[in-house]
């Protein structure tokens, strides 16, 4: 297996121009494909997950052109639901941001489409979404294991009253919200359980509004969506920088700054993960906000005990930053780490122990006590981009770290390690 050894880093300082947000990129691509008119997306993320969405749209007959660097995309909207001319199988890798929204959108009208993916995708639950779509009339068949992909979709979603469990993944609700306006009837979506990752729902609602569709949000407990609507192209749309990707550079600055400035997000960003900067500030770093940047300057870091449900992806970065904080850090209400690219609670606990931390792994929490001195380790990444990027922070100690399968960052940030090296000074 390929590996990358990072030598100790004495200091980080500089500016990072963030790649486009994965969450925003894939939502915007699908809405542009469903919309009337031509949409030009700029600062689109070029990564594996986005390529899976683009390939799926092409197979569904959507016409688009990409710039040479794949960050500008002109899409000719379909002006309504997407249909395959004949039976079709779409391979979506391990891209939840493609699998979940497409599973819903392709239930409009009549289709015969199979959605499948990598082995890990077949372990990521989708039953709550399927149950909700079936309540709205969709015909969906599990081809292997009940409640998991691959799925056969044969259309039929017309709207009506649907319940969806919000406690596992906000992507199920996102998928329903994006699909419901194009259904022939009105849809009332009721949330069962506690809704996780609410800020990701705000991204969805924000984008739907940009594409001309309004819905009624009743305190995140019920959503009322008028049927028979259509999406309209906003013309040109700039994809925000990826706030989850910003977390590694901001944390690096908190540990070994200097000052690091990330551009492409700022105080008015729609992504909930910008709140990661508030957590660093609470730990002792100095944060400065602009309209299109966030900067972080080193501070004496202290442990925290916090509910991290609102920033599940960026919270992983706090788990490795905790290695450099004084005291025991506890991250709570993070059960949904277990159904991501890997079981992130298990993976994080396992790899933190390798570098010498004392770790308690609970059902939905993790408690981390840093060692006096970090140990050299080979870090398994579990084909999870965030594990690779999180553990790069270990090099901010006086210990090297080896990251196995470093190219797994291609899911969201193909040149992450080059960007980190650019702002790093060797010890």
UniProtKB/Swiss-Prot annotation:
* Annotated EC: 2.5.1.19
Record's subunit section: Monomer.
- Asked if the Swiss-Prot or TrEMBL record annotates the protein with the keyword tRNA processing, the reply is no
Q: What keywords does the record list, in alphabetical order?
A: Amino-acid biosynthesis, Aromatic amino acid biosynthesis, Cytoplasm, Transferase
Q: Which residues are 3-phosphoshikimate-binding?
A: 22-23, 27, 169-171, 197, 313, 336, 340
> What's the gene?
aroA
Q: What class of enzyme is it?
A: transferase
Q: What is this protein called?
A: 3-phosphoshikimate 1-carboxyvinyltransferase
The active site lies at 313
> What reaction gets catalysed by this protein?
3-phosphoshikimate + phosphoenolpyruvate = 5-O-(1-carboxyvinyl)-3-phosphoshikimate + phosphate
Pathway assignment: Metabolic intermediate biosynthesis; chorismate biosynthesis; chorismate from D-erythrose 4-phosphate and phosphoenolpyruvate: step 6/7
- Protein family (similarity comment): Belongs to the EPSP synthase family.
């Amino acid at each position: 297996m390929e590996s990358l050894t990072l030598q100790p880093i004495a200091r980080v300082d500089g500016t990072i121009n963030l790649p486009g947000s994965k969450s925003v990129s894939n939502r915007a691509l699908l809405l542009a494909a469903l919309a009337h008119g031509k949409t030009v997306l700029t600062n689109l993320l070029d990564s594996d997950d986005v390529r899976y969405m683009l390939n799926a749209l092409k197979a569904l007959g959507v016409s688009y052109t990409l710039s040479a660097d794949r960050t500008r995309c002109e899409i000719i909207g379909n002006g309504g639901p997407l249909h395959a001319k004949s039976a079709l199988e779409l391979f979506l890798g391990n891209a939840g941001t493609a699998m979940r929204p497409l599973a819903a959108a392709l239930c409009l009208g009549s289709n015969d489409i199979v959605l499948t993916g990598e082995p890990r995708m077949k372990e990521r639950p989708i039953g709550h979404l399927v149950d909700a779509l079936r309540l709205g009339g969709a015909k969906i068949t599990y081809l292997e294991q009940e409640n998991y992909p691959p799925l056969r979709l044969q259309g039929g979603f017309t709207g009506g009253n649907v319940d969806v469990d919000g406690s596992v993944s906000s992507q199920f609700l996102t998928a329903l919200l994006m699909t419901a306006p194009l259904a022939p009837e009105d849809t009332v979506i009721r949330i069962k359980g506690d809704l996780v990752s609410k800020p990701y729902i705000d991204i969805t609602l924000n984008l739907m509004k940009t594409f001309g569709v309004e819905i009624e949000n009743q305190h995140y407990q019920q959503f009322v969506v008028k049927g028979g609507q259509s999406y309209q192209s906003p013309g040109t749309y700039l994809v925000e920088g990826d706030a989850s990707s910003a977390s590694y550079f901001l944390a690096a600055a908190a540990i070994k700054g200097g000052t690091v400035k990330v551009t492409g997000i700022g105080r008015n960003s729609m992504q909930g993960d910008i709140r990661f900067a508030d957590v660093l500030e609470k730990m002792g770093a100095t944060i400065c906000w602009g309209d299109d940047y966030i900067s972080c300057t080193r501070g004496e870091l202290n442990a925290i005990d916090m509910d991290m449900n609102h920033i599940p992806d960026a919270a992983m970065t706090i788990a490795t930053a905790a290695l450099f904080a004084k005291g025991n850090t506890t991250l709570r209400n993070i059960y949904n780490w277990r159904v991501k690219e890997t079981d992130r609670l298990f993976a994080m606990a396992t790899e933190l122990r390798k570098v010498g931390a004392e770790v308690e792994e609970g059902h939905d929490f993790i408690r981390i006590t840093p060692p006096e001195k970090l140990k050299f380790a080979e870090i398994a990444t579990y084909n999870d981009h965030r594990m690779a990027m999180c553990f790069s922070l270990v090099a901010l100690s006086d210990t090297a770290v080896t990251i196995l399968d470093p190219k797994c960052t291609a899911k969201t940030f193909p040149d992450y390690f080059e960007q980190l090296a650019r702002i790093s000074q060797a010890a």
